[in-house]
Structure formats: C-alpha cells, structure tokens
Amino acid sequence: MWTRSLIAVAAMLVVAPAAQAGDVRMFAVGHKHRVQDAVTYADYRNKMAALMDAGFPNRSAYVQAGVDDVASHLRPADPRAPRRALVVFPEEAGLINILIGSRGETSRRQTSVLGAVPSLFAPYARQFDHYTAKYPGQPAVRLLFLALTDTLYRSFYETFRDLAREHGVYIASTMNAAPARRVEAAEDPDLVALLRDPDEPDRGYAYEAVSPHAANTTYVFAPNGEVLVSDGQGRTLQSPSQTAGVIRGSTVKAYLTPSEQPPPAEFLGLALAFGAVQDMEVLDTPVGRLATVISKDAWMIDVNDRFEAKGANVILQPEAFSDWGFRTDEWAPDVFKEGGFANVQKYPAWQVNVDASLTGAFFNTVFDGQSAIIGRRTKADPGPLSPDNAWIGQNPDTGFLAVGPWIEPDPGIADPSLSLAQRRQQLTTAGLKLLIGPPCPDSLAVGQCRNGYRESIVWEDVRIPRGPVTARPDRVRGAPPAFGRSARVSGKEKQGPVAQHAPRVAAQGRYVYAVWHEQRGHVSNAFMAVSRNHGRHFHKPARVSANAAGAVAEMFPSVAAIDGEIAVTWQELAAGRSDERGRVMLARFDEKGRKRGGDARVDDTDEGGKWLPQVAYDGRTPVLAWIDERDRGPQDLPLEHVYAARAVGGGFTPNVRADAGAPVPLAAHLDNKWSPAIAAGGGKVYLAWADFRNYNWDIFFARSDDGGRTFGANVKVDDFTGFERIDERPSLALDPLGRVHAAWTDLRAREPDTNIFYARSDNGGASFSPNRQLDDSKQGFDPDTDTPTNQWHPSLAWAGETLFAAWQDNRLGNNDVFFTSSPDGGATFAPSERVDDTGSGHSEQSRPQMAWAEGLCHVVWEDTRSGNADVFTARRPCAAPPGKGKKPKP
C-alpha cells in the first residue's frame, strides 16, 4: 500500500480529550463510486486514498480531474490549518465493496441491481449457510450481507481505519453491515478458513458478524483508527478496544427507505435491519458533539429532537440521494433542503451540517447530489446567485459555507434574467443526459453523458463551542410594534453562563408562570419562575422537583394554571443519562409558586423511555399526555406512542394509550408518534400529536369524553396527501363554542420550507376544516428572486372572541418570534408582527409558547442574545372577554 510521509506529531494518532472551543476543518467528500473501484481490495483502498491525497500515485486513474483533496489542507502541508479535522464520506460508501474479488466477478458483469445482488448467493453459499444456521429466520438478502461480513470489514473497515491513522483525522463513513469481531486463525482455524476470502488464503484472520442485524451504519474513526461509539450514558468509547473486541458502528439508520426494508414491506430490497431511535447517541469528541443522521433520518422529527436534547452541535449527514436535476415536477434540491439544512436553522445550538453526497450509478440505480457544509442563516444579503450560495435551481441563501459543483453551473449565474422555471428546465435537460444521454468516453468523465456524475471535496473551518456559550452577544435592539420590551425570565447567572431550553408558560389572573430545563452539572434540571404582577418582572427561579440538584436528569417541563393552583410536569431519565427508561412526574404549587406536597409519578411502568409530557386542567383536575416507549414492535424495537392519565385522589388513573390504528407496512417498524399537545374542559380531553403510521408525519387527534380515562377514534387533521409530508408540533386551543382550533408546523408539496398551518373542528374533533396557511411569510413572495423561509413551533391561545398565535420564524434571515390574531374564529388572520426586540440582530429566538390572562398575551421563548440560551418573555395587550375587568398597563 502506498503511504504518505509520517504525520509530524505522533500525538495526533491518539484520541485527544474533549477540547475547548476552537476551529475544526471539516471536509465533505462526495465521491463517484465505480465498479472499477471494487475489483480488488487494493482498488477500493486506492480510490479512497487518492481522494484523501492529491499526491497519490496515478491519482487520475481513480479521481476526476480538478477534485480537491484532504491532505494538502492539513498540517504540516498547511501550517495555518486547525489542529483538528473531520472528514465525512457518503452513505453507501461501502456499497460497491460487495463486488470485490473473484466471488464478485459475475456480479460485476451485470447491468442491473436485480442481476448483481442475486449473483452473489452462489459464490457466498458456504458463508450464507453458516449464518443461516447461526441466525435462523432472517430474510435472504440480509443473510447475504452477513455472508459478506469478512469482505466488507476487510475492505471498508480496514481502509478507513488506516486512512484515519495515516492522516491523523477523524473520518466518518457508512456501509451496510452487522457488528463484527476479528477471529484469528490461531484461535479458530476452521472458522477463519470458512469466512476468509479465498483470494487471500494466507490471511491469518477473518471477520465474523456477531449479530443478525445487518444495518445501514456510520462508523466514526478516531485518529488512532478506533471506532467511536456511545456507552448510552453520554460517554464515548473506543471500539473494538473498549467493546470486548466487537467492532460496533457509531450510528445505525432508524428510518429506512422502501428499498432498504425487509419483507413484507419490500420484497426486492436490501432487507436491512432497523436501528432504534433510542440508540442514536451523541458522540462527545474533540471535533464536536457529533450526531449522525443517515439520509432519511435527517428529516425525522423525533430523531432530530432527541439529538438536540442530548446536546449535539455538529451534524453529519451521509447521503446517497437518488436524483438531483432530472425532473421539474418536484425539485430534488428543494426536497433535500427540507432536511439537514433546515434543521441547522431550526435548532440554535447546532453549528454545522456536513453533507457528503454519493454520486454515480450502481448498475441501474443512480445517486447524485452536491455535497455541502451548511451553517446558520443570517440577516445579511446573500448577494447575487453564485456557485457558493445555493444548490442548483435555487435562489441564493446565507446558510451555505461550502457547496460542491454539479455537472453544469446554474444558468441563472450567467443570465440573471432567467426565471426559476427556465433555470430548472435547462438544468433538467442536462440532468436527463446522465440517464439517457450518449455514453461517456470513460468512467471518470464529467458532463452531459450517461453516468457523467461529478465528484467533489469541499471544506470549511468551523468554530465549535464547548459549553453553554454558542455565539457572540447580540447588542442590537429594535422595538416591536405592539409587544413591550423583551425581558429575561431565567434570572442572573452568578456562576457563569447556563443554557436554558424548552420554555413553557401559563398565566392566571396577575400571575405568570414560566418553566424550562437547564444544564446543572452533567444533567438538566427543571426550573420555574413566577411573576406576580402580570409579567412585569419574575422572581428568582426555583427548582421544580425534590431531587437533589444535578442528581437526576429532568427535561421538557410543562405547566398549567387555574385559580389558586398550578401543575408542573416533566420527564426524568430513570437510569443515569440513558433515555431507555424514564418517568413522568407531576408537582403542584399554589398560585405564588409554593409547593404543595411531594412529587408524584404519573406513568405506571418502568419499561421504556418517556418524553415530552404535557399537562392541562379539566376543571380543577390535572390531565396529562406524553410519549411512551413501553410498547415493542417488530425486531423488538421500542415504539413511541401517546399515553395519557388523569389525577385521581392521591394518584393517577391507569395509563391509557391514546393513539390507535394499524400502521401501513412500510411503517410497521416505525409506528412512532411525537410532540403531543393537550387541551381539556368540561370533562373532555383533547389530544393532538405527530404520527408516522402512514410512513409520513401527519397530525392526528383524539378526544376523551370521560376525562382522559379512554379515548375515541383517531382523526387525521392535515389534509395533504402527497408523499413524504412532515407535519409536527401541533398546538390546540378551545373556544367557548366548543370549537377545537389546531395549528402545526407543516411541510407539504415537496417544498423547501415549512409553514404554520391551521384547521378548526366545529364538531368536537370528529372532523376538521380544510387546512390553510396561518403565517403570511409567502405574501408578495416572488419565486424568481426570493428565497423560501421556515416557520416552526406554533402556539395558540384563545381569549374572548379572538384566537392568538405565536411561532418561530426565519423570514428575516435568522430566527425571530412572530405573532398574529384572528377575530373571526380562524377565518382570517391579521398581518403578523414581531414579538422579540432584537431587530436586525444576529441572535436566535426559538421555541415560543404563549398564554393569555387578564387582557395580556404573554410569550416566552429561548433566546441567545447573551451568547447562550436564556428564557425571555414579552407581552402585549390582547382582547379581553367582555365584562372581565380592566386591562393592566403593558
């Protein structure tokens, strides 16, 4: 094997401890895979080594002309480079490896995937039989992947292990495989002889799968060649040295595409195993707190919310996207922008998304995309369209740090007079030739010819914070039109910056109650602050629970208030920092925030995690709903379901599952629910949640007529039927006429942005009105010149004859909080207005929630103006019910 000169600093070959804030040079490698690179183990290794180093001998035989590398941008070649580097390779970087060697010769001659994969069964028959006996009952194609274990680890694992060591960098790369161990011939010569590639008869070891679950897996290699994995308690281990010799992957893909799924959902697919959402963990490393979202996982709301809750700040998105510029009925870069790009904007703590996109044809299956490094949007002008500020067929945006090229530049760069439709039509004309154009002159050719896909390497230096301070302070202020000055609820931070997250609010009379969770030691604790003067100022925050400070992880508190009493619920982790077992807790307080009694446990089982509890009062009785993982699905995976309970006497009614109905076959392993909302009154309890039963995220609703003891039929609220819709975070409000108002974050029609949508039920939730967009972000929108923006996290409140709404909105660049009202029961909404007072500042305002009391709308949100996340609030006069007293002064 060819090697470059030794790394100058030997210390780079060991895993350094987690460091303070500093720059990391991040690379996205979007290579083109070719059958020629999988003839021998050396061919595959040479391809990857040539991508890493432009000085690799005969590089032009493996890499397209003009493609950058990694090595020339590392120390000592670049003395100005940061000391740490992270290199991300695409999803399916190990797919072609199944063709390696004499056993893959027949498969390499095929012209389709359906010809190539079955051609491997005969040459791998002995290994197939071994795993059939060891793991009976597995789908045939999954057993084939098990039979391929030695080939895959010999090629993929050893290549990237050695490249990480050689270059002293962190490398993330992805293949379809099960966890494995290396077996030495001295230990078990017969097993090694059985599993070892016959092309290497003198090799003194082989790799054996130790699980039947061959899965789409990302491996994060440290500079010493070890794979970094989580211990489930927030600590990062090295594999195999700290995992009993088993080589484990860092992250397993949870939400499989149809072609990846096993029967009966898909009979001609890869039959991969599903990862558990609960097992997707953040890796704390010197290059950031890494979270990996493999392709479809980047769009999944529960996956991303969990990573946010676990403190991720660097998102790795290995991709094998199926098309890019082939069709105009849905624009693939727009669909792609819904995922990792949008989530970096949505979650203020996320600093960067590294998207490495595979290109090239795998027989008749094609992959294409533009690798990119994505940061946070700003209020700055992105400037004219360029190769560096948009994917093809899109308008310029400020979120791009680096973008790989496509086979042709966007024609709008050279001719700004072109409409968006004209630009996309020209791009599609070029893109179709990748599928049906004339043959390319060779396999590395780029351009408008069959399989002329472009590969690329892009990089950027990114400052990664350690600790709660994530940005520079924002001193800019601008008075909103109707809301008063924004004020910090979460109190002074005498011991240094503390990050506060996920605020919620309730109000009753002159009292306003805000709750949130904040980091204390290694875990989060729930806090509450009380205002006794209509939100003018808040008293010192206090712990909610009776747990010792920092002893138990407490997250996502929610609060409800009635005259003379408030109730606060929160989730606890029941096994250290693991989210595999949890509790839902409730505490009651008097109107001044003084605790009444002890903490009470709401859920009735130790099985499974518990997430996102919500509380409301039915009369003077608390009712609660939450996400509960006690139920198991296929592959014994825990599923996220909606459970509810009602306070009774000194305890609670038996927990009852509120969601009902069978999932479609594609969602059988993924019958998950998320982000419940609750409202109650008159003995009725109303729930809404996001639901994946249809292999899309929809908003579903259920009503209980007996105070939460049982629930009726589930009703779908959103009315869009297109594929891969993503609707989340519902909010509910009830009015005196018994109407149910619902709003949610809505992603429909394969558009690149989310909006706030609204529907109303006039029959208690039996059916809902046609959906309509609540926010006005698209008024005056010109698709030829304007860039779509995102609206998230709606919160509804009803008072008198008016419906009020607040939400997170980045129409101005970065996140702000906006507000509107409807005086006619949701038929029309007033023009939206700003809530926060940061004007044109760079800070982020996110996750708002609203409450109404005595003529005032109170909004709380998460705010980074101080450099770390704090809880802020603002208020404005809002319509009061007739005859209900005077409005206090704002």
Q: Residue ranges of each PLM-predicted region?
A:
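Bacterial N-terminal signal peptides that target proteins for export
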Residues: M1-I7
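Bacterial N-terminal signal peptides
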Residues: I7-V14
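N-terminal, active-site-proximal structural segment of metallo-dependent hydrolase catalytic domains
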Residues: A19-A85, E92-I96, S102
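Beta-strand-turn-beta hairpins that frame and shape the catalytic cleft
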Residues: A21-F27, V35, A244-V246, D279-A291
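Cys-nucleophile CN-hydrolase/nitrilase-fold catalytic domain and related Cys-dependent amidase chemistry
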Residues: D68, S72-A222, E226, F321-S322, ...
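CN hydrolase (nitrilase-like) catalytic-core segments centered on the catalytic cysteine
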Residues: F156-A172, P189-E200, Y207, R289, ...
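Short beta-strand scaffold segments in enzyme catalytic cores
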Residues: N216-V220, E281, Q370-I374, V458
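Extracellular, repeat-based ectodomains that mediate carbohydrate processing or recognition
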Residues: G478-P890
